[in-house]
Design a protein with these regions (language model features):
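Non-catalytic alpha-helical scaffolds and adjoining flexible linkers that form interface surfaces
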Residues: 1-23, 28-58, 62-165
C-alpha cells in the first residue's frame, strides 16, 4: 500500500508527550492548515526528528495521513523562533483560534513574515501580530489595521471578545 506524503513549511506551535518516546505536535502549515501530528520515537536519543521539530520553530515538515493523527515522517529546521512573550502569546492565541485542517495561506504568510522579521519583540510588535492574525481570521476589518496603538488594542479586544475565548 502506498501513502501520499504531504510536505510543507510549518510553524511548530506546541507539543505534548504521548506514551514513552512519542510526541504530538501542533503545526500550522501553509498547505494543510493546523495539523496535529504524531512523531514516533522522537524523544529517543537517536531520533532523526529530534531538534528539527521543536516548539517555536519554522521547519519544512512531511506528513502522512494516519487513522487518528497525521504522522510526522521528516522535518528540517529552517529557523528557530524566539520564545519571548511578545512572540509566544500571539502563537498561543493562533493555536486557540484556528480550528480544523483548513488551508489559510494568507494567514500563514502573515505569521511567517512576523516570525522572520528583525523587529524588536515588544508590545507594538505583539499588537501588530495579533491584529494580523485576527484580520486574516475575520475578526477585524481592514480599516482596524491602520488605527493608532490604543484604538488598535481596543479593536483587538473586541475581536477576541467576538471569538468567545
Amino acid at each position: 500500500m502506498s501513502y501520499h506524503i504531504y510536505t510543507s513549511r510549518g510553524i511548530v506551535l506546541s507539543e505534548r508527550p504521548m506514551r514513552e518516546a512519542d510526541r504530538i505536535y501542533t503545526v500550522m502549515t501553509r498547505d494543510l492548515g493546523l495539523v496535529r501530528a504524531l512523531a514516533t520515537g522522537v524523544r529517543k536519543e537517536p531520533s532523526k526528528l529530534r531538534g528539527n521539530i521543536e516548539p517555536f520553530s519554522l521547519s519544512a515538515v512531511s506528513f502522512v495521513k494516519g487513522r487518528e493523527y497525521w504522522r510526522l515522517t521528516s522535518a528540517e529546521l529552517i529557523q528557530r523562533i524566539s520564545s519571548a512573550p511578545a512572540m509566544a502569546r500571539p502563537l498561543a492565541l493562533l493555536e486557540k483560534l484556528i480550528q480544523g485542517e483548513s488551508s489559510n495561506p494568507e494567514l500563514f504568510s502573515a505569521v511567517e513574515e512576523a516570525v522572520l522579521s528583525t523587529e524588536p519583540y515588544n508590545e507594538i510588535f505583539e499588537a501588530n501580530m495579533v491584529s494580523k492574525i485576527l484580520f486574516h481570521l475575520g475578526y477585524l476589518k481592514k480599516s482596524d489595521m491602520t488605527l493608532d496603538k490604543k484604538d488598535l488594542i481596543i479593536a483587538i479586544n473586541n475581536g477576541l471578545q467576538a471569538s468567545h475565548l
